[in-house]
């Protein structure tokens, strides 16, 4: 029985020693992150869709900060994200990538042909914003309010029943941009 306790104590001491060495090394050899990259990464929508040409939002933020990449390539973030990045970097806002001529592109949303859906859940696993709901071997559907139109759910579908379709702007689908609405605060007088 003593041999077991000796082995437990030895392994515990080794774990403690190696943990202390790793803790010291992580602080001693730490690499400082670029604070500009961190701020840009916080502004980006974190959908990891790859529409900007980079595998995720962090690599795109690094490319903007370090390589001078254009700030207008984030499709899910749109103009709001581009304007925030332009303000952060003190650069001129640019027209969104690929739409220099058109002012507001049609918003695309994934649509599942429920007659052909086999319920494999591959689209649910691929969706970075959890806009697709359903269960194994059950009908799946897309919550259009959450869908960013990133196209990541289309390729994994084995029956090819997912397509991106433009959404017509209706009073139900139109989003108020509260930052562009002028708001004036009117002081209230209190009478005693």
Swiss-Prot record:
Cofactor: [4Fe-4S] cluster
Enzyme Commission number(s) from the entry: 7.-.-.-
GO cellular component, one term: plasma membrane
InterPro entries referenced in this protein's UniProt entry, alphabetically: 4Fe-4S_dom (IPR007202), 4Fe4S_Fe-S-bd (IPR017896), 4Fe4S_Fe_S_CS (IPR017900), 4Fe4S_Ferredoxin_RnfB (IPR050395), Elect_transpt_cplx_RnfB/RsxB (IPR010207), RnfB/RsxB_Proteobac (IPR016463)
Keywords, alphabetical: 4Fe-4S, Cell inner membrane, Cell membrane, Electron transport, Iron, Iron-sulfur, Membrane, Metal-binding, Repeat, Translocase, Transport
Compartments (UniProt record): Cell inner membrane
Pfam family, one: FeS
Main location: membrane
Stretch list, region Hydrophobic: 1-26
Gene3D superfamilies linked: 3.30.70.20, Electron transport complex subunit B, putative Fe-S cluster
Occurrences of domain 4Fe-4S (ranges): 32-91
Thylakoid among keywords: no
Alphabetized NCBIfam families for the sequence: PRK05113.1, rnfB
Function: Part of a membrane-bound complex that couples electron transfer with translocation of ions across the membrane. Required to maintain the reduced state of SoxR.
Protein name (database record): Ion-translocating oxidoreductase complex subunit B
Species per Swiss-Prot/TrEMBL record: Escherichia coli O17:K52:H18 (strain UMN026 / ExPEC)
């Amino acid at each position: 029985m003593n041999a077991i306790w000796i082995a437990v104590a030895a392994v515990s001491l080794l774990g403690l020693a190696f943990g202390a060495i790793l803790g010291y090394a992580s602080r001693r050899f730490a690499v400082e992150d670029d604070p500009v990259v961190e701020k840009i990464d916080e502004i980006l929508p974190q959908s990891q869709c790859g529409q900007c040409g980079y595998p995720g939002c962090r690599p795109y933020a690094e490319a903007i900060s370090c390589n001078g990449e254009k700030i207008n390539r984030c499709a899910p973030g749109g103009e709001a994200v581009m304007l925030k990045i332009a303000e952060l970097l003190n650069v001129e806002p640019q027209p969104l990538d690929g739409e220099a001529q058109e002012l507001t592109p049609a918003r695309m949303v994934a649509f599942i042909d429920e007659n052909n859906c086999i319920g494999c859940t591959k689209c649910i696993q691929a969706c970075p914003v959890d806009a697709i709901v359903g269960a194994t071997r059950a009908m799946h559907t897309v919550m259009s309010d959450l869908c960013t139109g990133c196209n990541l759910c289309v390729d994994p579908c084995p029956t090819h029943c997912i397509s991106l379709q433009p959404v017509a702007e209706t009073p139900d689908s139109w989003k108020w941009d509260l930052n562009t609405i002028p708001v004036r605060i009117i002081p209230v007088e209190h009478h005693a």
